[in-house]
A protein has these predicted regions:
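Short aromatic-glycine-enriched beta-strand elements
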Residues: 21-33
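Short boundary/loop segments of OB/S1/cold-shock single-stranded nucleic-acid-binding domains
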Residues: 1-18, 80-81
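A generic structural micro-feature
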Residues: 6-8, 24-26, 57
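Beta-strand/loop nucleic-acid-binding surfaces
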Residues: 39-56
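Loop/turn positions that initiate beta-strands
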Residues: 59-62
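Short, flexible N-terminal segments of the mature chain
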Residues: 32-40
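Short, Lys/Arg- and Gly-enriched loop/turn segments at beta-strand edges
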Residues: 68-79
C-alpha cells in the first residue's frame, strides 16, 4: 500500500459518495484519491453518518480523511480555496 497512514490525516478529492444500507444501518461509501498520490489511486471506505463532517459532500470536493490504525474514521469537507 503506497503512503499508508496508521494514524493521522491526508487531504483528498472526493470522487464518489453513495448511501448504502448494511443490515438496515445507514452508511456512506466514499471513493477518493489522495492529493499527494501522483498515480491518483482510487481508495474506498465505508463510514457511518457520524463520521462525515460537513453539510453535503459532492464529487470533486476537497476532503480531509482521518485514519486510525489504517482505517478511515472521519471525513471532513474542506473549505473551497
Amino acid at each position: 500500500m503506497i503512503g499508508a497512514v496508521l494514524k493521522g490525516t491526508r487531504e483528498a478529492v472526493l470522487r464518489r459518495i453513495q448511501p448504502i444500507s448494511i443490515h438496515g444501518q445507514m452508511s456512506w461509501e466514499i471513493v477518493f484519491t489522495h492529493l499527494d498520490d501522483p498515480g491518483e489511486q482510487l481508495n474506498a471506505a465505508r463510514v457511518g453518518p457520524e463520521a462525515v463532517v460537513g453539510q453535503s459532500l459532492e464529487p470533486g470536493d476537497r476532503i480531509s480523511v482521518e485514519y486510525l490504525v489504517g482505517v478511515v474514521v472521519k471525513v471532513t469537507r474542506l473549505p473551497t480555496l
